[in-house]
Each structure stands twice: as structure tokens, then as C-alpha cells.
Regions:
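Membrane-interface segments at the starts/ends of alpha-helical transmembrane spans
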Residues: 121-125, 129-166, 266-283, 361-367, ...
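A short, mixed-charge helix-start or loop-turn motif at secondary-structure junctions
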Residues: 59-60, 202, 457-461
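A structural signal for multi-pass alpha-helical bundles of membrane permease subunits
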Residues: 106-114, 210-525
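Hydrophobic, aromatic-rich alpha-helical transmembrane segments
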Residues: 14, 21, 62, 66-69, ...
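Generic hydrophobic, helix-prone segments enriched in Leu/Val/Ile
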Residues: 62, 111, 179-183, 438
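Ordered, small/hydrophobic-rich secondary-structure cores
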Residues: 59-152
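N-terminal signal-anchor/first transmembrane alpha helix
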Residues: 2-42, 46-56, 74-82, 86-89, ...
Length: 525
């Protein structure tokens, strides 16, 4: 395919430009795929070289180090303590003691059971209960983990098994830092310099390393409350974990490999068409995200331009009125609006009183109408945010650009399309994929307005999906209502969560890299 220079491209007609861009997009796909695999290969090569260099450095440090350094390979912190860095050495030693204690008391056991997720499940016993003097009856009782600690708990095995792996990785990293510290300390002493004392270490925590001190707690929180649950959720997708495995005779769950992914993409499993259900909900989710993003974006800009227009009075009043929708919690406003449009709601009553309609309109009972309604109501919610963003940007567009355009005879539409819109896209471009992602996971609007209903076209499926359900609300219903004998299907919800992430990540990366603010950032500056 021939590549045009900038001058040649400008000479093309609009249709030829469109054709050129269209063909260029598809021509770039093989190159992009090749670069992707090339990047993946380069990443693994870089990781391999990094591991090899680390291993070489560890061996060299051990061979060339003194006896204090060598002993630190076994007893963390020994070299630091022996060289007078007592505080640093005690922290290393304490971490090692805690790690060994955890592994002996809990970690090793859970890690050993991780491949099977437990073998001893809840069991039944028969008890004799005296209900009258000298008269007994037999009662069958199920003994669970709560009654007998020797019964395996698959949930805890998976959770603590993952936590143990995290702990092992943290220990290896800390051990490596311990080795490096000994190498550095040995080199400093050989050069005749003095090592930092415990007071110096504490002082540096609020001085040159203050950033590390501030980030320590947030990073720990992210690891424990974001990364760990995320890994746990991903692993659940490869098990048969459901509410049926929370206790009773089926308290254990096991690894099933890719079976859950196969189930989701199967046409018929136990009378349920998972693949068609997932496809329809995914399509509606993408349609919803598209309209929810771009209607709010362009209408928000339009409202900001109208309010900012010269001659418009009470600008602060109009902005305040719009901001009121932000000030009121969505939980309250959306539930109220939902009730307004019911069969016996305020809106139907108002139209009937005026004689416009004689039969109440079922806004939430018709699939197409319900979908249109949630998009319209989302516009009411989202416009004020974009209005505020656009107002600030519009005030910063140089006025001389518009004056020059007027002198050249540019119409209002030309000024908008050639000055305002490009400027807005440069500044707010990254907001679009962010907003699109947020709308794909917009739980509040759908759940509070329709609850996912009506249940007309998608009545048969896990979680009882509705016609306005997004992937995120369907996922939620699967974890609450479930379907069939398994009850709440946590494994299926995890699979959907992984697929949602993949879809959102791919779309966001593609759109982000096509934005003018990314491609032409230097030109704008």
C-alpha cells in the first residue's frame, strides 16, 4: 500500500482520505500483531537475562564476600548486626523469623493442599438424642469445618495458599535486598568510609527517602486489598466454586481447568445457552457504553458552549441548577426517577391527566423502551460533569483564534469543527476511554433504574439475566441468585470478570492510541 506524504494527503478528497485511513488501519494490523509478539518475546528475554544476572551476582557476592556476608545468606541481617547496623539487621532477622513461623504454623500446610484444594470434606455422623426418659431417636448430623477443624476448607486453602505464595515472593525479594546490603556495606568498609547508623537510617526515612516512607502503607494496602483479591478472583475462574460448596456435604471445591471458559462459550449446557446470553449482553453493554459516553460528551460540550455564549444571563444560576444533579446522591435520585416512570408513577399520571395518553406506558416492561430510557436518564446524570470540564477548557481557548476565523468568514459550525472540537479532543481525549470503561462497568444506573429487567428476551440463563443487564450487573446477579443446583456461581462470575477486563483493556488501548492527544501531542504543544 502506497504511503502518502502530508502534502499528498491534503490534496486528496474527503472520500479518498477516508479510504486511505480505512485501508491504512487494516494494513497496520499484521504489523501491530507482529510487534505485539515481538514485544512479548523481548519481555521474556529481558526477564531471563535479568534473572541470570541476579543469580550471577548472588554467586559472586557469596564467593568474594567475607564470613559475615556468607553467614547472612542463612541468617538474614547477621552481616548488618555484625557491622554495627543493628536496627537494619534486626528488621531483616525479624522478617525471617516471622516468615519461618508462618510457614511452619500455616503456610506450608495450605501450600501443600493448594494443588488439590483439600481432600477431607464434611462428613455425616449419627447421634442418639434422648427426647423422653429412656427413649432415644437417631439424628443424622453433617460435621463441617466449623465443627471439626480437621475438615478441609477449600476457600481458606485457596486464599491462604495465594497469600503464602505472595509471602514467599516477598521473602525472596527481602533476602535479595539483604544480600545486596551486605555487599554494599562490605565495599564501603573496604574503601575506609563509615557505615550509616540506625539513627541515620531513621533520619533518612523522613528526609531523602521520605517518598518511600509515604508510599509504604498505600502500596501494602494495594497488595493486600487489590492485588491479592484480584489474583484470588482469577484463580476462582479455574475451579467449580459456588454457593453449594460453602458447607454441608459439598463443602470442598476443586480445580477444573478451562472447563468454565468452555461452558461460557458453549451453546447448550443443561438447557442454558451461555454463549448466546453472553454475546447478547456483551453487545448491549458495548452499545450502552458507546451512547452513554458520547451523548454525555458532546451534549456536555454543547451545554457548556450555550451557557458560556455572550448574551446569556444568569450563567452561575444555570451552572448551579445542573450541578444539583451531582450534589444529590445517585442512590436517591435514580430510585426516585425509577418510581416516576412505573405504570402507576408520576409521569404516567401526569400524561393521563393532560389527556395525552389513555393507557399507562410500561417504560420498564418493554426491552427497547427500557434501554432508551436508561440512556436518556444517564444523559441527565452525566451532562453536568462534562459541562464543568468543558467550561474550564472553553475559557482557555485563545479568543484570537475565533476572531481570525470570523474575519476569514468561517461559520459557527466551521469554528466549532476546526477550533473548538479539536482543542477539546486534545485536552479531554484520554477522558473518552476512561469514561467508556466506566460506563461498561456502570452498575448504579442500570441496577437502580431497572434491576436489569425486563426479563423478556433473556429470561433463561445463569443469574436470570434481563434485557438491560450489563456484564457487570449480570455478574453481580450470578453471585447472588445463581442458576440451577450450583446456586450462586462464583466460578462463572470470575470468568465473566476476566473477559470484561480483556474487552475493556483491548478497547481502551486501541482508542487511547488513536487519540489526537496521544498521536499529535508535540504538535499541540
Amino acid at each position: 500500500m502506497k504511503k502518502y506524504t502530508d502534502l499528498e494527503y491534503l490534496k486528496l478528497s474527503k472520500w479518498e482520505r477516508f479510504q486511505y485511513k480505512f485501508l491504512s488501519f487494516f494494513a497496520a494490523i499484521p504489523v501491530a500483531i507482529w510487534n505485539l509478539f515481538k514485544g512479548i518475546g523481548g519481555f521474556f528475554k529481558k526477564v531471563g537475562l535479568g534473572v541470570a544476572n541476579e543469580a550471577k551476582d548472588i554467586w559472586t557476592t557469596f564467593v568474594e564476600g567475607d564470613w559475615k556476608t556468607k553467614l547472612s545468606y542463612l541468617v538474614m541481617g547477621f552481616g548488618c548486626i555484625a557491622r554495627g547496623q543493628v536496627l537494619r539487621g534486626l528488621l531483616f532477622l525479624l522478617f525471617e523469623v516471622v516468615f519461618i513461623g508462618y510457614m511452619v504454623l500455616m503456610g506450608a500446610g495450605y501450600l501443600g493442599l493448594l494443588p488439590s484444594l483439600g481432600t477431607k470434606g464434611p462428613y455425616q455422623i449419627t447421634e442418639k438424642i434422648e427426647y423422653l426418659p429412656g427413649r432415644f431417636r437417631e439424628v443424622v448430623k453433617t460435621v463441617t469445618y466449623a465443627d471439626d477443624p480437621t475438615v478441609d476448607n477449600s476457600f481458606k486453602i485457596l486464599l491462604y495458599g495465594v497469600l503464602t505464595i505472595f509471602f514467599i515472593v516477598a521473602f525472596i525479594y527481602t533476602w535479595r535486598v539483604n544480600v545486596k546490603q551486605n555487599k554494599i556495606a562490605e565495599g564501603i568498609l573496604k574503601s575506609g568510609k563509615k557505615l550509616k547508623s540506625g539513627k541515620d537510617d531513621l533520619r533518612s526515612m523522613v528526609d531523602d527517602k521520605f517518598h518511600a516512607t509515604l508510599l509504604a502503607l498505600p502500596l501494602t494496602g494495594i497488595l493486600l486489598f487489590t492485588v491479592l483479591p484480584l489474583v484470588f478472583m482469577i484463580l476462582v475462574a479455574f475451579t467449580n466454586y459456588s454457593s453449594a460448596h460453602n458447607g454441608g456435604e459439598t463443602g470442598l471445591f476443586h480445580w477444573v481447568g478451562l472447563q468454565n471458559f468452555q461452558t461460557l462459550f458453549s451453546w447448550d449446557v443443561g438447557g442454558v445457552n451461555y454463549s448466546a446470553t453472553f454475546g447478547e449482553i456483551l453487545l448491549w453493554t458495548l452499545i450502552w457504553a458507546f451512547f452513554a459516553t458520547f451523548t454525555n460528551y458532546f451534549l456536555g460540550i454543547a451545554v457548556a458552549m450555550i451557557i458560556n455564549k455572550k448574551g446569556i444571563k444568569f450563567k452561575k444560576v444555570w451552572r448551579t441548577v445542573l450541578i444539583m444533579t451531582i450534589a444529590i446522591p445517585q442512590f436517591i435520585s435514580l430510585l426516585y426517577v425509577s418510581k416516576m416512570f412505573t405504570l402507576n408513577g408520576l409521569f404516567n399520571g401526569f400524561l393521563m391527566d393532560l389527556g395525552i395518553i389513555h393507557t399507562a406506558i410500561d417504560f420498564w416492561g418493554q426491552p427497547t423502551l427500557a434501554r432508551v430510557m436508561v440512556i436518556i436518564i444517564n444523559i441527565w446524570i452525566g451532562i453536568p460533569y462534562l459541562m464543568l470540564i468543558a467550561t474550564g477548557i472553553l475559557m482557555n481557548i485563545p479568543a484570537d483564534l475565533y476572531e481570525s476565523a470570523k474575519i476569514d468568514g468561517a461559520s459557527g459550525w466551521k469554528q466549532f469543527s476546526k477550533i473548538t472540537l479539536p482543542y477539546m479532543l486534545f485536552i479531554t481525549g484520554p477522558y473518552l476511554p476512561t469514561s467508556f470503561t466506566g460506563n461498561m462497568n456502570n452498575f448504579n444506573v442500570i441496577y437502580l433504574l431497572t434491576g436489569g429487567g425486563p426479563h423478556v428476551n433473556l429470561s433463561n440463563g445463569a443469574g436470570n439475566p434481563g434485557d438491560t443487564d450489563l456484564l457487570i450487573t449480570w455478574l453481580f446477579n450470578i453471585t447472588q441468585k445463581g442458576f440451577g443446583e450450583d446456586g450462586a456461581q462464583y466460578y462463572l462470575a470470575s470468568v465473566i470478570g476476566i473477559l470484561v477486563f480483556i474487552v475493556v483493556a483491548v478497547i481502551s488501548l486501541i482508542v487511547y492510541n488513536l487519540l489526537p492527544s496521544v498521536k499529535n501531542e508535540e504538535d499541540f504543544q
